[in-house]
Amino acid sequence: MQQLQNVIESAFERRADITPANVDAVTREAVNQVIALLDSGELRVAEKINGEWVTHQWLKKAVLLSFRINDNQVIEGAESRYFDKVPMKFANYDEARFQKEGFRVVPPAAVRQGAFIARNTVLMPSYVNIGAYVDEGTMVDTWATVGSCAQIGKNVHLSGGVGIGGVLEPLQANPTIIEDNCFIGARSEVVEGVIVEEGSVISMGVYIGQSTKIYDRETGEVFYGRVPAGSVVVSGNLPSKDGSYSLYCAVIVKKVDAKTRGKVGINELLRTID
């Protein structure tokens, strides 16, 4: 694996000079191997090690290199044709392989090659970009998008129209992460490498980036880039110091533990916020 990483790191340093016409065989093979390993879930761009999320930057670099070494090509679809550098993940799947891997894909859901989809996942008509990791038991609902290299945990519900930001455009240092057992409400956006920690519930229409204030109304504490575990979050506003205006924020209205969350439905958690 170290040799593979060395090839990727070296090629990335000279990426501006690499084209599909001049890329060497060693680099092409290394990039293709990494994409295949990301596709199968054997590698992932970020993982939790000793309780902390670690981003493997070289894997992200391999994803970026894949755009340098490949030409656009015609991609056949059921209703149309497409023209892109990245093949579709399920292009060569047959019924036996779908049965073996154990997830559902509802047309016209689109998943790019290099994204991992775990067992018991349901993909409604949605989009999952290259390098993303979607873990077991997760629902990606209609028109939700999972951005490049985003990490989605087990038993997550991404509601209709949710946007989970990617790392490629604009270029971000770390992927957006939704940990296990989270619920992200309809039309919410979580971007720019924000981490939503385990068991959190995000109401509909909440927008969180690195500069968004995440205000805990019980403690007065303000977080940036991280929603603490077990938070129930709604959209809100905080006043300026002189009270002349207010700016958007996300508000943690309560905290719930796994026991409470197991007893109470998501809708009830969001309705009883006073």
Curated annotation (Swiss-Prot):
Family designation: Belongs to the transferase hexapeptide repeat family.
CDD domains attached here? LbH_THP_succinylT (cd03350)
Q: What would you give as a GO molecular function for this chain, any one?
A: 2,3,4,5-tetrahydropyridine-2,6-dicarboxylate N-succinyltransferase activity
| Subunit structure, interactors included | Homotrimer.
Entry's localization field: Cytoplasm
Q: Which BP terms from GO are recorded? A: diaminopimelate biosynthetic process; lysine biosynthetic process via diaminopimelate
* Top enzyme class: transferase
Name its pathway: Amino-acid biosynthesis; L-lysine biosynthesis via DAP pathway; LL-2,6-diaminopimelate from (S)-tetrahydrodipicolinate (succinylase route): step 1/3
Could you tell me what this protein is called?
Answer: 2,3,4,5-tetrahydropyridine-2,6-dicarboxylate N-succinyltransferase
On the tree of life, the source organism's domain of life is: Bacteria
Q: Does the keyword Repeat apply?
A: yes
Q: What is its EC number?
A: 2.3.1.117
Reaction(s) the record says it catalyses: (S)-2,3,4,5-tetrahydrodipicolinate + succinyl-CoA + H2O = (S)-2-succinylamino-6-oxoheptanedioate + CoA
Q: Which GO terms describe its cellular component?
A: cytoplasm
UniProt keywords (A-Z) are: Acyltransferase, Amino-acid biosynthesis, Cytoplasm, Diaminopimelate biosynthesis, Lysine biosynthesis, Repeat, Transferase
Name its species: Cronobacter sakazakii (strain ATCC BAA-894) (Enterobacter sakazakii)
Q: Note the PANTHER family from the entry.
A: 2,3,4,5-TETRAHYDROPYRIDINE-2,6-DICARBOXYLATE N-SUCCINYLTRANSFERASE, MOLYBDENUM COFACTOR GUANYLYLTRANSFERASE
> Which residues does the record give as substrate binding sites?
R104, D141
- Organism classification, top ranks? Bacteria, Pseudomonadati, Pseudomonadota, Gammaproteobacteria, Enterobacterales
